[in-house]
Regions:
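Conserved N-proximal alpha/beta basic substrate-recognition cap immediately N-terminal to
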Residues: 1-88, 95
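C-terminal active-site "lid" helix and adjoining low-complexity regulatory extension at the edge
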Residues: 216-243, 247-252, 261-314
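Cytochrome P450 core scaffold surrounding the K-helix E-X-X-R motif
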Residues: 118, 187-189, 279-284
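A long amphipathic alpha-helix within ATP-dependent nucleotide-binding catalytic cores
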Residues: 141-150, 167, 176-262
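Active-site nucleotide/adenylate-binding loops and adjacent lid/helix of ATP-dependent enzymes
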Residues: 52-160, 165
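Short, solvent-exposed loop/turn segments at secondary-structure junctions
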Residues: 77-78, 110-113, 144-145, 167-169, ...
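Short gly/pro-enriched beta-turn/loop segments at secondary-structure junctions
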Residues: 155-159, 168-174, 193
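Protein kinase-like catalytic core scaffold
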Residues: 104, 174-176, 268-270
Length: 314
């Protein structure tokens, strides 16, 4: 409570208790969730200027990294757009649909929290039916994941969430933590949709235990029986790619990127998350979300709290 007292007169220790009970580790630098979402994140990411980067249709236009999933066509506010974001007619869309290799991925342009709204049409007819009455979406290639990740769960993509921080002291990008997310029983990899998550240490090794949304622990994948004690392949390349992408994001200091390793051993960035960052993957493994940067962030947020700017404007 003492460590976080400057942010609230009454500290809720439920986050601390939960992290301690799950990990067996007690650390005062575990961030209380209500403080993270009301004080820390809004201060570090105190702008709506980059909210357009949460739209998946704009990834390939903004980022120099060309490994994002190929987009076949888009719909933005009811208008159909081609790969280059040029306006096209529905008859053009029908022509594109006839030439696609199925299955494909249909997903909302943004707000896919928990995998909401993501579908995998297996035919022209299924995709056409799914377009009916919908807007603000993108249709992409379906990535074939690397055999290493297929071992854990072959249904959908198993992704690695990489959380990064642009330091307030030197503006350099640092990786905070990484987590492998996997589907279970046919679910997507999102924990809120029934998936599980396994923390990855700084060397790229899984920490041996996966956790579901209820805090239940698994030493082996419930479906495949694969142990969570392996090393992530091409881990250094993952770190390099995540830092490269994050360096192209400005006006925010916290970023979370979701990656999948494809069959060609290439890390494919799937999604960019700038708001509502998930902190419990690391903390449930006994690691404070901000790690060695906790002290500098706390001091920065005390002096530069977003609410102070509102007060000054008034």
């Amino acid at each position: 409570k003492k460590y976080w007292k400057d942010f609230s007169g009454s500290i809720n220790i439920s986050t601390f208790r939960s992290c301690k009970n799950i990990s067996g580790i007690s650390d005062p630098k575990f961030i209380p969730e209500e403080i993270f979402f009301s004080d820390i994140e809004p201060t570090l990411n105190n702008t709506s200027s980059v909210s357009f980067l949460t739209y998946k249709s704009f990834y390939t236009k903004w980022f120099s990294n060309n490994c994002f999933p190929s987009c076949y066509f888009h719909n933005v506010d009811g208008e159909f757009l081609d790969q280059e974001l040029n306006s096209i007619s529905f008859s053009d869309v029908e022509k594109i649909i006839k030439e696609l290799k199925y299955p494909v991925v249909f997903k909302p342009n943004r707000d896919t929290y928990g995998g909401a709204g993501v579908f995998f049409p297996k035919s022209q007819e299924e995709l056409l039916n799914h377009l009916n009455g919908r807007k603000n979406f993108v249709v992409q290639e379906k990535i074939i994941q690397h055999p290493f990740f297929n071992e854990f769960n072959p249904v959908g993509l198993n992704t690695i969430r990489v959380c990064l921080y642009r330091s307030v002291s030197d503006n350099k990008i640092h990786v905070l933590n990484c987590t492998l997310r996997m589907g279970v029983g046919g679910s997507l990899d999102n924990v809120t949709s029934g998936g599980i998550a396994c923390y990855i240490d700084g060397s790229g090794r899984l920490n041996g235990v996966s956790i579901d949304k209820y805090g239940k622990k698994f030493q082996f994948h419930p479906d495949s029986g694969i142990s969570f004690s392996k090393n992530i392949p091409f881990f250094s390349e993952l770190i390099e790619s995540s830092i490269n992408i994050s360096s192209q994001i400005f006006y925010t200091r916290l970023m979370s990127l979701d990656f999948s390793l494809d069959i060609n051993r290439t890390w494919r960035p799937i999604e960019v998350n700038l708001f509502d960052n998930t902190i419990y993957f690391a903390q449930n493994a006994g690691v404070p979300f901000l790690g060695v940067f906790t002290d500098e962030v706390v001091e920065y947020c005390k002096k530069n709290h977003w609410a102070l700017f509102l007060t000054n404007r008034g």
